[in-house]
């Protein structure tokens, strides 16, 4: 069995799918259990994207969940708690600093880093019934930090020529 994967579509999404599979998560089953019902697309100002999913089995009365991924600093600013071994705890300043220090270490080594977080969308959130009314301002707050995803993101082949051109300039 090869340890290489062939993927179609967005490379970041594909990488996250491979990571999930290597962690023992049945991604097909997960997609069926939590179908995506809305996406708040990535934009360069927010430096993140969010997806909203229905839960086939409500968790504590919660029927929907939002997931967010993006630049660690920006995602971390939206988090008020952290998931530690399945236990939701308040996110402390020292934990924030540790996370950003880890991010900086990875980035200095040329690795691409994404932060991942979630939020259970409960009735107390007072969200509108219409999914089209779900905005980043309503969804992307009070998040629970899950972790950092670190990827080797090699430069595109055309980068070598661009760098050489810059050196000759």
Range-by-range predicted roles:
Residues 1-145, 151, 157-169:
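Cytosolic catalytic regions of ATP/NTP-dependent phosphoryl-transfer enzymes
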